Amino acid sequence: MKKHRLIPVLLLKNGWLVQSKGFVNFQNLGNPTTAVKRLSEWAADELIYLDISDSDIYNIRRDDQGYPNRKTFLEIISDVSKYAFMPITVGGKIRKLEKINEFLKNGADKISINKITRIKPEFVSEAAKEFGSQCIIVSVDYKNTNGN
């Protein structure tokens, strides 16, 4: 019997959890820490957090629901990992081995890389050699050309 797995992909834009239609219009869904608590209760098998922000520094200008104002994606992942009872995959703007190391030290279990694989394909091998192939994931963006 095939086991079904629940693996939500959460998009973070400027420190907020968002929903997107074609990466054009974004609807704010709230605090990423609150979401991970809820998904832990729902027994998600894994979480994927993707940073789609324009900047590396966030200024959300308030403390939401008693959670401190996190200023970087790394701080958010560090905070979220305290409440996650499942593996966390992190992706977005990861172009250096040092950044992978920082995320792994701050609670990430796996790293998703995307754009750098087109610019520097050997980065996948370098990352797998340094951190192990079990924690490096390559994600691929695609677009249908026939309009569907």
Each predicted region: which residue ranges?
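Hydrophobic faces of well-ordered beta-strands that scaffold small-molecule active sites
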Residues: H4-L10, Q19, L47-Y49, I88-G92, ...
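Active-site mouth loops of central-metabolism enzymes
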Residues: L12-A35, P87-I94, K143-N148
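Conserved anion-binding
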Residues: L12-V18, L104-N148
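Short glycine-enriched, charge-decorated loop/helix-capping segments at active-site entrances
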Residues: K21-Q27, D54-I57, R62-Y67, N148
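Catalytic domains of carbohydrate-active enzymes, especially glycoside hydrolases
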Residues: T34-L50
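Generic structural signal for hydrophobic
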Residues: R38-W42, V80, F103, A127
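Alpha-helix-loop-beta-strand connector modules within alpha/beta enzyme cores
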Residues: Y58-T89, S125-Y142
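Catalytic cores of alpha/beta
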Residues: E75, D79-I111
